[in-house]
């Protein structure tokens, strides 16, 4: 019995789900592949900022702009970022399971080495404390959303990149992307 090609492809890209409609069709689970991740690993340095994007997810729809999330590379293959579970340290390989990733170096620092070291130390301390996620995006509390964490660890370097969204000033991932405080080192948008 010969199985049609379309059926093999369809069943290979369809995932079972525990709620209706019971199936999810994802022909490309993640577009950033092994070769892309190798280039990221060869490029990234401690203190670099990474942005990522997932296609087809609700949070991507609700986050204005192309990029949806930010983290800081702290060395030892670890990214620190703020997620709904709090501020965490995660393996860079897990962070890069996405549909697009961009790596930036921070530029125009007056004392680059000590400022980057301080940013890394602040990020690691936030992860060690597992600082809560800032669900109200107020900036007036001791919790962080992803890009706010990046701004705080770099001593409010991105203050000029906030935009008014949802009735308050918010640093969007695209704000970091367009900032004069960073330089793109690598962009993977397969």
How would you describe each model-predicted region?
Residues 1-190:
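Cysteine-nucleophile amide-bond enzymes
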């Amino acid at each position: 019995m010969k199985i049609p090609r379309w059926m093999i492809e369809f069943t290979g890209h369809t995932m079972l789900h525990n709620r209706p409609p019971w199936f999810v069709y994802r022909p490309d689970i993640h577009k950033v592949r092994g070769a892309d991740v190798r280039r990221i690993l060869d490029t990234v340095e401690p203190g670099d900022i990474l942005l990522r994007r997932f296609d087809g997810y609700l949070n991507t729809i609700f986050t204005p702009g192309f990029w949806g999330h930010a983290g800081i590379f702290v060395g030892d293959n670890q990214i620190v970022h703020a997620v709904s579970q709090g501020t965490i340290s995660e393996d860079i390989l897990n962070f890069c399971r996405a549909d697009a990733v961009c790596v930036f170096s921070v530029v125009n620092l007056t004392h680059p080495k000590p400022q980057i070291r301080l940013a890394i130390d602040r990020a690691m301390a936030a992860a060690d404390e597992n600082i809560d996620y800032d669900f109200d995006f107020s900036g007036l509390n001791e919790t962080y959303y992803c890009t706010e964490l990046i701004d705080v660890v770099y001593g409010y370097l991105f203050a000029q990149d906030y935009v008014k969204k949802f009735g308050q000033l918010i640093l969007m991932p695209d704000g970091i992307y367009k900032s004069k405080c960073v330089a793109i080192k690598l962009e993977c948008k397969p």
